[in-house]
Amino acid sequence: EYHCATCDSQHNYNKSEVKGYRSVKKEDVDLFKKAKRQWESSPELHEYVPSEDIPEGHMTSVRNPIFDHGYEKWADMFNKRQLLSLSSLLYEIDKLDNQNSKEFLLLALTDCLRRNTMMIGYSQVANQVSDLFRTNAFDPPTRPTESNVWGAEYGTGTFKSTWEMIIRGVE
């Protein structure tokens, strides 16, 4: 996703008129492959990812059989880059001594999870990545959208934007 920097400074425009998307470039693919290699060579992070099977239930196997889409374990809902990013956050949070700090950071992380899985699509109406809980089911999107876990100048559901919201709430 990109924005027009000139328009951004004017603040008198419709964001959807200057917002756009570029095609995937080789550097994007290379970055993804690098993250995948890093994930695969970081076994210490794997303990922060649930290894359990997704249980069969009314919403997972009857109404919208998630298993028909290749999802068997909770970890299947994330790509390797997401697993690397999210488990790295958990790994660092886990090392903190201050319990209050840990809990605030975990609060930010859990909110960040809502928009950082392969179960997320793009909402054309809202002009942003959708939310995992947009429906009362796990309904895999036809075209998953990967958000930026860490944060960017624009974006919703990033760790940075959620953390800033928590800080404002605490202050």
Q: What is the predicted function of each stretch?
A:
Residues E1-E171:
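Nucleic-acid modification enzymes, centered on SAM-dependent nucleic-acid methyltransferases
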